[in-house]
Every structure is written in C-alpha cells, then in structure tokens.
Regions:
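Contiguous, amphipathic alpha-helical segments that mediate oligomerization or scaffolding
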Residues: 2-32, 36
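Ampiphathic alpha-helical segments that act as solvent-exposed interaction surfaces
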Residues: 10-11, 17-25, 78-124
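Amphipathic, interaction-prone secondary-structure segments
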Residues: 25-84
C-alpha cells in the first residue's frame, strides 16, 4: 500500500483525532485569538514508518509551525488500529496561572478516543 492509500484509509480516524485534540484545547478556556493553529489532517506532512514489531508500514503525520521549521504535533497510526497524537499549546493556563500547558494528547481507536492536556507546574 502506498502513502496516498494510507492517507485515505486513515482519514476518518485522523479527523476524529484532530477534532478531539481541538476540543481538548478549547476546554482549557483560551481566548479564540490566543490559539493560532489547530490540528488539521490536511495540513499535516505524511510519511510511512516501518513498525519494527509487525514489519508493516504505518502512517505518521507531523504538523509544523507557520514557517515549516518547528514540529508542533504528530499523529501516529499503529498496526493494531490504534493511534497516538500530540499537539503543542505552549502557553500559561488561562484559568490556572500556576500551571503551564505544554500540549494536548489523544489516543485510542475509532470507537474510543481519549484525550488530556499535558500540564506542568510553573516555576515558583
């Protein structure tokens, strides 16, 4: 299977994962103008990575900043139908100023997608 086939086959799950990451970012309560980029499947760069366990090639997606220099997120599909995604936020929590939001993560499979924010305590 070539790259374009992997992109097409994984589209529905990828769009659900992107939506879940976006919901998790929005739950944090940032003002609309504070978040400049959200994960969008069509904005990703795509590559196939060989799974060392199964030998199959799995789709991996990367998101980059507006200058295409710094990676700000990734979405990895696994041979068993699961995925893991993370997307950078890198901002002080809007409602809890003693916490820093590193990013959000999502994982699971089509019928069960979980997500959470990655929070770090601010240096005191």
């Amino acid at each position: 299977m070539d790259l374009s086939e992997h992109i097409a086959i994984n589209r529905q799950l990828a769009e659900s994962a992107c939506q879940r990451l976006t919901e998790e970012i929005n739950k944090l309560g940032f003002a609309v103008a504070e978040i400049k980029h959200y994960p969008n499947y069509d904005d990703a760069s795509f590559i196939l990575i060989k799974d060392p366990y199964t030998g199959q090639h799995n789709l991996t997606c990367y998101w980059y900043d507006e200058f295409k220099k710094q990676r700000i997120g990734s979405l990895q599909f696994n041979s068993d139908g699961t995925f893991y995604a993370e997307y950078d936020v890198v901002k002080t929590h809007p409602g809890k100023l003693t916490w820093f939001v590193e990013g959000v993560t999502a994982w699971g499979k089509a019928d069960s997608i979980k997500a959470e924010a990655k929070l770090l305590p601010m240096p005191g």
